[in-house]
């Protein structure tokens, strides 16, 4: 299903009982987080707080939307799919775009016509009078303190913008980059842009500084874009494909964009709110601490400051927000859904992979379980190295467990049985030191640098062991069938 904007998606969620309107006055200071967290853990609906107030009780006159992607099925719905399993089709499309193959013949070419039709929706459509610019604020009228920006946890240093889609462009790039980076509010017109050095926005900024020393770097931030555009910003799209183009594929219609008022960056035309401004390469500020998706408060570190020169918005704008904390939180739920997108991408490069699972309790990316159809001695170690190196999304994965295809990667009882019966700790553990690690990972000895562990929990082949390998116990199919026929009659359970 196509959603023209965030409001269209909200209407659909309300029709199917997946949106709850909260009319009571609710404070954006901590209370909204607690309500959202309890709702998410109960697998409840998206929440629209229609009467958001400040800590002192002052009304904001702007509703707040939280838990939009609070269940995997809502993520699938936002991607135009009926359920999470159908997201494998999205992954297959991305795998094809990442490494396209020519048709093997006329019949194969006919089979790929639907894909080619989808590709026609990739170019953006520029709108001259966009909804996102119905209201324009500049100069002294720019005041972020009038927006219902959440303070999520007791130890958070300041209100935090969490769902902003930051739009950047490198000096030698035609395509724009969309990334979601949290932004600490410093004052009425300044926020801190917290992006890690390997992320697209940070790389664009570094290239700009080299080419234009001392100059201000233009940035725009969209809040409340349509669901396809939001998810395009968090999906592992190929580097050659823009997030706007991928959003068009998801939506089945071209992404509508508009030129920012103060710069040449294109923003989602139907977004609820746009922040426009610049980064001064000389202006940095300490960011944090904030409660993060790890379940801990992160360290304070310096990041560039964005000066907001303009705020544009729709009439009766909705502020889209979230919180991050110990899983499950909204990023963890997104991770569960996007896991299905990753599987076909990995399988295209490594056909032996049967399943791939990132447990949400592992902070969505720090531990991976892979099952393979093992073909030779040492095969598991090759797969470990492949996972760490193939997609940048797995650069920070600390632990990779590889099992045979008789193990259910998503069942801890199965995985632990394989680890305890098929692993020798010395022989089957791979340790790699001094590798890139998420700087939020305070368990690493050095910020941003730590070790990785691979665990080979597969059955061992000749060359990997000198011992006779155990044969798993299993009942014959004939006896299973006999008991199946008797089972109801026995009335045991």
Swiss-Prot record:
Prenylated FMN binds at residues 180-182, 194-196, 199-200. It is an enzyme of class 4 (lyase). Binds 1 prenylated FMN per subunit. It is found in: Cell membrane. It catalyses: a 4-hydroxy-3-(all-trans-polyprenyl)benzoate + H(+) = a 2-(all-trans-polyprenyl)phenol + CO2. The active site is at 292 (proton donor). It comes from the Bacteria. InterPro entries: UbiD, UbiD-like_C, UbiD-like_N, UbiD_bacteria, UbiD_Rift_dom. The keyword Iron does not apply. GO terms for biological process: ubiquinone biosynthetic process. Mn(2+) binds at residues 177, 243. Its EC number is 4.1.1.98. It is a peripheral membrane protein. GO terms for molecular function: 3-octaprenyl-4-hydroxybenzoate carboxy-lyase activity; metal ion binding. Pathway: Cofactor biosynthesis; ubiquinone biosynthesis. One of its GO terms (cellular component) is cytosol. Keywords: Cell membrane, Decarboxylase, Flavoprotein, FMN, Lyase, Manganese, Membrane, Metal-binding, Ubiquinone biosynthesis. Catalyzes the decarboxylation of 3-octaprenyl-4-hydroxy benzoate to 2-octaprenylphenol, an intermediate step in ubiquinone biosynthesis. Homohexamer. This is 3-octaprenyl-4-hydroxybenzoate carboxy-lyase. It comes from Colwellia psychrerythraea (strain 34H / ATCC BAA-681) (Vibrio psychroerythus).
């Amino acid at each position: 299903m196509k959603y023209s904007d965030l409001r269209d998606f909200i209407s659909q969620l309300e029709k199917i009982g997946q949106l709850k309107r909260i009319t009571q006055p609710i404070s954006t200071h901590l209370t909204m987080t607690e309500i959202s967290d309890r709702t998410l853990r109960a697998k409840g609906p998206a929440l629209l707080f229609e009467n958001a107030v400040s800590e002192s009780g002052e009304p904001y006159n702007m509703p707040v939307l939280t838990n939009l992607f609070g269940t995997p099925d809502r993520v699938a719905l936002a991607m135009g799919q009926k359920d999470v399993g159908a997201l494998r089709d999205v992954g297959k499309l991305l795998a094809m775009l990442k490494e396209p193959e020519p048709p093997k013949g006329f019949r194969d070419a006919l089979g790929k016509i639907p894909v080619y039709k989808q590709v026609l929706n990739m170019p953006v459509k520029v709108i001259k009078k966009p909804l996102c610019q119905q209201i324009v604020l500049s100069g002294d009228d720019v005041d972020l303190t009038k927006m219902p920006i959440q303070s999520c946890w007791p130890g958070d240093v300041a209100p935090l913008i969490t769902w902003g889609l930051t739009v950047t462009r490198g000096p030698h790039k035609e395509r724009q980059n969309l990334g979601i980076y949290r932004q600490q509010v410093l004052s009425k017109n300044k926020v801190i842009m917290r992006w890690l050095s390997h992320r697209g926005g940070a790389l664009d900024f570094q290239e700009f500084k080299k080419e234009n020393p001392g100059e201000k770097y233009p940035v725009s931030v969209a809040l409340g874009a349509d669901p396809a555009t939001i998810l395009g910003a968090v999906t592992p799209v190929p580097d050659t494909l823009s997030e706007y183009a991928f959003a068009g594929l998801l939506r089945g219609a071209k992404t509508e964009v508009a030129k920012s008022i103060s710069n040449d960056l294109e923003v989602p035309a139907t977004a609820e709110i746009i922040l426009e401004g610049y980064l001064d390469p000389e202006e940095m500020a300490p960011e944090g601490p904030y409660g993060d998706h790890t379940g801990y408060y992160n360290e304070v570190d310096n990041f560039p400051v964005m000066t907001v020169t303009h705020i544009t918005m729709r009439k009766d704008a909705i502020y889209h927000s979230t919180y991050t904390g110990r899983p499950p939180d909204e990023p963890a739920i997104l991770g569960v859904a996007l896991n299905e997108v990753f599987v076909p991408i990995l399988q295209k490069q490594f056909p032996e992979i049967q399943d791939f699972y990132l447990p949400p309790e592992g902070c969505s990316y720090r531990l991976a379980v892979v099952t393979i159809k093992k073909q030779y001695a040492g095969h598991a170690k090759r797969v470990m190295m492949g996972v760490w190196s193939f997609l940048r999304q797995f650069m920070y994965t600390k632990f990779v467990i590889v099992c045979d295809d008789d193990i259910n990667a998503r069942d801890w009882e199965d995985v632990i049985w394989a680890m305890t019966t098929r692993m020798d700790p010395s022989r089957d553990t791979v340790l790699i030191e001094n590798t890139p690690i998420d700087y939020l990972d305070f368990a690493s000895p050095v910020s941003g640098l730590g070790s990785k562990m691979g665990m080979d929990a597969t059955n061992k082949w000749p060359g990997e062991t000198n011992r006779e390998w155990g044969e798993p116990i299993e009942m014959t199919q004939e006896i299973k069938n006999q008991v199946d026929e008797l089972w109801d009659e026995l009335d045991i359970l």
